[in-house]
Design a protein with these regions (language model features):
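Conserved N-terminal segment of class I S-adenosyl-L-methionine
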Residues: 1-99, 103, 116-123, 128, ...
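Short, contiguous strand/loop micro-motifs
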Residues: 32, 112, 150-152
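A short beta-strand submotif of the Rossmann-like class I SAM-dependent methyltransferase core
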Residues: 103-109
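Hydrophobic adenine-recognition pocket in adenosine-nucleotide-binding enzymes
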Residues: 109-112, 141
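Short glycine-dipeptide loop
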Residues: 129-135
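Short, glycine-/aromatic-enriched active-site segment of Class I SAM-dependent methyltransferases
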Residues: 137-156
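Short alpha-helix
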Residues: 156-172
Length: 219
């Protein structure tokens, strides 16, 4: 936290430039209940995995994404890390391994962390990545209206995309691209009509219709 304020103006300059890296086209997402029917978001992340040799899934959860990756022919090393006890993971803490990774995945984890802990984790991620390695982070979009009306008691800190971009760049990542992720309920005409109306209303209200955001940062 002190590091952020000690470099406040540098971080502010980075934050002010965040809009340049936002991808205008949104990416559809829905749960990976059937590995044969992945969403656009899962296909996007899979492309990054297939280009790597050594992957760390930080906060691997129910391991569905790992199963999806392996079913699609990934031949590299895929390490799963989580503090949970419901599934078998390779690690419970990043300090348990001295390996370097081409890709670190961190899906829907950082909103469970206060800022000082997350900043410390970013530094660890940077040290664990190979030169040119990539970090993928997804988190709820604070600019989405659900942030105001719905919540999760385990979420302790929202991360606006502007600040997340500044933190990534300020902690040694050379570049970052942001994707806007939309929870896609179905392909029915009714949902398309609802979604079109939602886009109009959120524009009027000055909020975003993208439910989540995803960053791909390069070390």
């Amino acid at each position: 936290m002190d590091d952020y304020f000690n470099n406040y103006w540098t971080m502010k300059k980075l934050r002010d430039g965040a809009g340049e890296i936002v991808q205008k086209k949104f990416v559809k997402f829905y749960p990976l209940n059937d590995p044969a029917r992945p969403s656009e978001a899962h296909k996007l992340w899979l492309n990054y995995v297939m280009s790597a040799n050594n992957v760390m899934d930080f906060g691997a959860g129910d391991l569905r994404f790992r199963e999806f990756v392996l079913r699609n022919g990934f031949k590299g090393r895929y390490r799963a890390l989580d503090i949970g006890k419901d599934f078998k993971y390779d690690f419970a803490d990043l300090d348990e391994t001295r390996e370097k990774f081409d890709l670190i995945l961190c899906f829907e984890v950082i909103e469970h962390m206060e800022l000082p802990k997350f900043v410390g984790l970013l530094d660890k991620f940077r040290k664990k990545l190979t030169d040119g390695g990539k970090l993928i982070i997804t988190t709820p979009n604070i600019h989405h209206i659900n942030h105001f009306w719905k919540g999760d008691v385990t979420h302790v800190r929202p991360y606006p995309y502007e600040d997340l971009y500044a933190l990534l760049r300020g902690h040694g990542f050379k570049s970052a691209v942001m994707y806007r992720i939309v929870w896609w309920e179905s392909e029915s005409p009714v949902f398309y009509a609802k979604f079109s109306l939602r886009r109009i209303l959120t524009h009027i209200l000055g909020v975003d219709y993208a439910t989540n955001i995803g960053f791909v940062a390069s070390a």
